[in-house]
From Swiss-Prot:
This is Cytoskeleton protein RodZ. Keywords: Cell inner membrane, Cell membrane, Cell shape, DNA-binding, Membrane, Signal-anchor, Transmembrane, Transmembrane helix. It is a single-pass type II membrane protein. Residues 30-49 bind DNA. Residues 148-244 are annotated as: Disordered. The gene is rodZ. SUPFAM superfamilies: lambda repressor-like DNA-binding domains. The chain crosses the membrane at residues 112-132. Residues 165-205, 217-239 have a biased composition (Low complexity). The keyword Membrane applies. The helix-turn-helix (HTH) motif in the cytoplasmic domain of the N-terminus is involved in the formation of spirals to maintain the rigid rod shape. As this protein is anchored in the cytoplasmic membrane, the HTH motif may contribute to protein-protein interactions to form the RodZ helix, which is localized beneath the cytoplasmic membrane. The C-terminal domain may be critical for determination of the rod shape by probably interacting with enzymes required for synthesis of the peptidoglycan layer, including PBPs in the periplasm. Pfam families: HTH_25 (PF13413), RodZ_C (PF13464). Residues 1-111 are cytoplasmic.
Amino acid sequence: MNTEATHDQNEALTTGARLRNAREQLGLSQQAVAERLCLKVSTVRDIEEDKAPADLASTFLRGYIRSYARLVHIPEEELLPGLEKQAPLRAAKVAPMQSFSLGKRRKKRDGWLMTFTWLVLFVVIGLSGAWWWQDHKAQQEEITTMADQSSAELNNNQSQSVPLDTSTTTDQAMATTPTSPVDTTATNTQTPAVTAPAPAVDPQQNAVVPPSQANVDTAATPAPAATTTPDGAAPLPTDQAGVTTPAVDPNALVMNFTADCWLEVTDATGKKLFSGMQRKDGNLNLTGQAPYKLKIGAPAAVQIQYQGKPVDLSRFIRTNQVARLTLNAEQSPAQ
């Protein structure tokens, strides 16, 4: 009878009340139970008061109750009916997977950003290419225009073009000229030069030298002797004057061409010394009044010497542009 009464009394008690009675019989406090089970004191108190915290899953609550029962030596089988009532299994609320949606939105945003970046890059490359092509086309058109203008000017006025071998042709013409007229002129002009101081000479000397002998001596006198004239008389030309190379002008402009090149040269007076196309292996020797203004279509195809010194065209060659420069007396080219 006593056993059945005790069993009925235990069934009447709730799970929390049975755990509290067992704890008190063992002389344990709620703090001691919480420390042994590694729980909060509030959690132990809720279990003894048959409360189910809303923020605690039923699975964890059932586990805490079983651990509490083993601690106070209560069989788990006796607590199972009460556990179904105190901590029924509840379906866990699964939160929506926001991380996936956030990642998807971030990926979409990154895709738009990457597309915009590539678009800007393509636009910059396209603008750079268009600018380079327009600049190159403008240079080619400018060279063509200058070449057409020079051709028209050459057709209208051939005197503006300077021959390539002007100095050489002149020297050859002077060298091949017969020397007999020069000698005759020198002889005829020397006779007055020798007889000019005759009034100042002793009359006896005039009587000794007959006129015919004087003519013979004058004709036989070599050309260098004719330079010894009295004071105030101008020196007379000789046979060597026709074959002597003229002195080089210090302002001469010498150009050698390694390829076909369009060229225009203007001196300080505005006269065009040359305007036209020069062929490969050609050379040009120009003389005028400095400073010279030059326009060169292909700077890499020409070598210029001014006052015996080379002119530096490397800055035009590097940029592959039409060279516009001025050569002054100090040979300081300026664009």
